[in-house]
């Protein structure tokens, strides 16, 4: 069925904004944990993989194995990219101030735009302008005291590039359900870090924070991203998701763990303005989807749909 892009675009924006809000909890939740990095990653991966697996089982009406087989090479690529991005992002947060990591994540729209161009996606002049404003806002935020170390910078860039690549693959392969790929990515994270984790560190309050990181900050965020990336161009997804980088430092500030400088506040306002510029952009372009835009809970057995069947 053919539907207008203006019909589906609000849903793509909403899904991506929800992903950004969930992702923004990473810094504040990570700061509450008192355990080694391997235990953090392995523990979060357990909850994330279980949450997404349950979703896949319900959405596919018990046909879990066929669902995982259907992802093919694109789904495997997304799973690997998500694995690397997840591990690198939390590693960066553990050794670098939240605001510094967020500044580097702001480059994702540019990376996604370049990758999208290579795969044939057009980029409108207004989108380029909005991206420039967003990056400029984070450049202002970078004026805050302190610079990230080499290791923190490296892990932040790795996470950013893998995140951008995930957006492009998900958009270009809209017929592939990314829910099983999301689950697989967390299984891979667990497999990599579990041998170095310590179960004794995961009790008490730590267990609750790990559950929040796995189910909300990781599982739901990646799921909403996979939905949003199928409804709007890769570069728009990457730009709207920059709200994560504004909200992340905000939560840490509200908790009294880090206090933003004036440049950070000014930069955050600029970024919000850039996002507003992008999401209010009208378009008469058309896109072909397998379901009507009003069917938010479409048939998940359709390989082109990773949403839940009510």
Write out the residue ranges for each language-model feature.
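C-terminal-most transmembrane helix of multi-pass membrane proteins
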Residues: 2, 45, 242-310
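Loop-to-transmembrane-helix transition segments
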Residues: 11-19, 63-90, 150-159, 194, ...
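Helix-helix packing/entry segments at the starts of transmembrane helices
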Residues: 100-107, 170-188, 218-254
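C-terminal transmembrane-helix exit sites in multi-pass transporters
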Residues: 56, 91, 108-129, 246-266
């Amino acid at each position: 069925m053919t539907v207008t892009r203006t019909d589906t675009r609000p849903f793509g924006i909403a899904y991506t904004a929800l992903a950004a809000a969930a992702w923004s909890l990473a810094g504040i939740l990570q700061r509450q944990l008192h355990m080694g990095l391997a235990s953090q990653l392995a523990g979060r991966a357990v909850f994330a993989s279980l949450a997404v697996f349950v979703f896949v089982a319900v959405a596919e009406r018990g046909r879990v194995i066929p669902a995982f087989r259907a992802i093919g090479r694109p789904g495997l690529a997304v799973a690997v990219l998500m694995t690397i991005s997840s591990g690198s992002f939390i590693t960066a947060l553990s050794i670098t101030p939240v605001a510094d990591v967020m500044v580097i994540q702001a480059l994702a729209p540019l990376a996604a735009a370049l990758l999208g161009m290579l795969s044939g996606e057009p980029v409108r002049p207004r989108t380029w302008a909005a991206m420039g404003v967003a990056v400029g806002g984070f450049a202002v935020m970078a004026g805050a005291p302190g610079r990230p170390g080499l290791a923190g910078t490296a892990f932040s860039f790795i996470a950013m590039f893998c995140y951008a690549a995930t957006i492009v693959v998900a958009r270009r392969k809209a017929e592939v359900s990314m829910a099983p790929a999301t689950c697989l990515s967390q299984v891979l994270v667990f497999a990599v870090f579990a041998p170095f984790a310590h179960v004794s560190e995961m009790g008490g309050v730590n267990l609750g924070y790990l559950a929040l990181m796995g189910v909300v900050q990781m599982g739901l965020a990646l799921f909403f991203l996979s939905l949003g990336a199928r409804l709007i161009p890769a570069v728009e997804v990457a730009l709207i998701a920059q709200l994560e980088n504004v909200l992340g430092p905000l939560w840490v500030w509200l908790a009294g763990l880090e206090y933003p400088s004036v440049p950070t506040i000014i930069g955050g306002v600029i970024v919000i303005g850039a996002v507003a510029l992008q999401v209010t952009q009208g378009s008469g372009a058309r896109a072909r989807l397998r379901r009507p835009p009003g069917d938010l809970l479409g048939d998940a057995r359709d390989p082109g749909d990773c949403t839940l069947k009510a």
